């Protein structure tokens, strides 16, 4: 079975990525990949180098983003000015300040234009940290594929009660996660997928992946396997 990784970080994911775009492409060729995606944290700055290296190697480049998201399911996501600990003004989502992760992929030229619009808006609208709002994501959703994201995503944190690892998933948490998944499905249709990451040494990932199997059966949302590398 051919595998195409749809979640990857180069050194352009500052502080969280390893290897240049050229090195990632070289490794993909070693593994006999025919295509691969790059999904940097909050930016698309690696895409030019990635595309150049991929095309030279006969590899299909897939352009993506791991976005920092505010209330992405709220189209009218209000923002407010806050004073941070240093006394500087910050513009943050009014409904909570925690940013969840979301994997976004461009499936065509229109999608790539919209991906860059989303990134640009995330820097223009929010102070210090680029943040994708519900309005930006939903108004630029044409040509995009949305994966539910890593264990820091809205769906995963709803399911697992935050960043910790519960001994088991309680029914109220599953019902809340089901509602989140259905709302994403309602917004993005067949372009929304549950993202499974096979990090079997991490209890959190195992709990998340098992629950996603159940969510997939209950909702009809397809699953996709990625390696968050």
Predicted segment positions?
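Phosphodiester-processing cores and adjacent nucleic acid-binding clamps
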Residues: 1-229
